[in-house]
């Protein structure tokens, strides 16, 4: 596709993207069942508490987290419940509740801009807040190696359940959204800035700033991508005017 100058995008769960109302004029590659497995690279029965796990890019985070919990593997609880896949989690250095992928990532196998398959260490991936070298390039993540640890299945499941309860309590899961809308500006919290600007409940068409959590723009039923863009542009303008802080989208726009 690159040689033929055909535009393309690779997605896993597609949970953190906003697609233009006109669609995407190119090829959409979904990493499906052929990229949704995992394996232990170390015997979890040996004397070491450390466990290395290799997971394919299309593996859903919640599915992997639940299977790891059943096997008594801890350290992945923070990611269990994030609506995404391994590939996207590496690309964005996904994180929640005090954990980030950079804390557990050893390396990732990628296809680079020249079509060469490479194994990049965590340092080479340049993981930062919701970004990586993958996000800054046209690299495609194929799989990731994670460093986790042994634990008690019941304790791990309990931790996962507690985090799931927090998500249900604080996040507007009752409405469709593309997840957290804005990245956290250094020294601030995007949701607090938006709320302090008086924008909770603010709407454009069917898109609305969640009244439950101002960090989410939700679809109240008939939102278009245009509605979402108009609303996020307005939010950025108001926050800049009131607080002098620039907000950057965490949601990835496609086809614009």
Residue ranges, per PLM feature:
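Phosphate/pyrophosphate- and phosphate-bearing ligand-binding catalytic cores of soluble enzymes
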Residues: 13, 17, 111-256
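Anion-binding (especially nucleotide phosphate/pyrophosphate-binding) glycine-rich loop
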Residues: 1-86
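Hydrophobic, well-ordered secondary-structure segments
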Residues: 61, 65, 79, 83-87, ...
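Short Pro/Gly-enriched beta-strand edge/turn motifs at strand-loop
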Residues: 89-92, 127
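Residue-level signal for beta-strand positions within conserved beta-sheet cores that form or flank
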Residues: 51, 104, 245-247
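Gly/Ser/Thr-rich helix-start
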Residues: 13-15, 24-27, 59, 82-89, ...
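Structural signature of FAD isoalloxazine-binding scaffolds in flavoprotein oxidoreductases
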Residues: 18-37, 91-121, 136-143
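Short coil/turn segments at secondary-structure junctions
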Residues: 47-48, 92, 219-220
């Amino acid at each position: 596709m690159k040689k033929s100058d055909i535009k393309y995008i690779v997605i896993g769960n597609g949970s953190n993207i906003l697609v233009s109302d006109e669609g995407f004029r190119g090829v959409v590659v979904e990493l499906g069942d052929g990229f949704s497995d995992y394996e232990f690279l170390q015997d979890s029965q040996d004397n070491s508490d450390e466990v290395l796990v290799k997971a394919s890019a299309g593996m859903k985070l919640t599915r992997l987290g639940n299977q790891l919990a059943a096997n008594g593997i801890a350290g992945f609880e923070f990611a269990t419940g994030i609506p995404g896949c391994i590939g996207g989690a590496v690309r964005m250095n996904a994180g929640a509740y005090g954990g980030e992928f950079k804390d557990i990532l050893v390396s990732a196998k990628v296809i680079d801009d020249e079509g060469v398959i490479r194994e990049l260490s965590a340092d080479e991936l340049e993981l930062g807040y919701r970004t990586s070298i993958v996000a800054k390039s046209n690299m495609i993540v194929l799989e990731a190696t994670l460093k986790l640890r042994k634990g008690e299945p019941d304790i791990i499941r309990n931790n996962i359940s507690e985090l799931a309860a927090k998500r249900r309590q604080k996040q507007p899961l009752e409405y469709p959204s593309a997840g957290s809308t804005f990245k956290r500006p250094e020294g601030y919290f995007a949701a607090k800035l938006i709320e302090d600007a008086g924008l909770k409940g603010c709407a454009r068409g069917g898109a609305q700033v969640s009244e439950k959590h101002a960090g989410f723009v939700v679809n109240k039923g008939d939102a278009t991508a245009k509605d979402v863009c108009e609303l996020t542009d307005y939010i950025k303008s108001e926050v800049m005017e009131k607080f002098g802080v620039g907000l950057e989208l965490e949601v990835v726009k496609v086809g614009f």
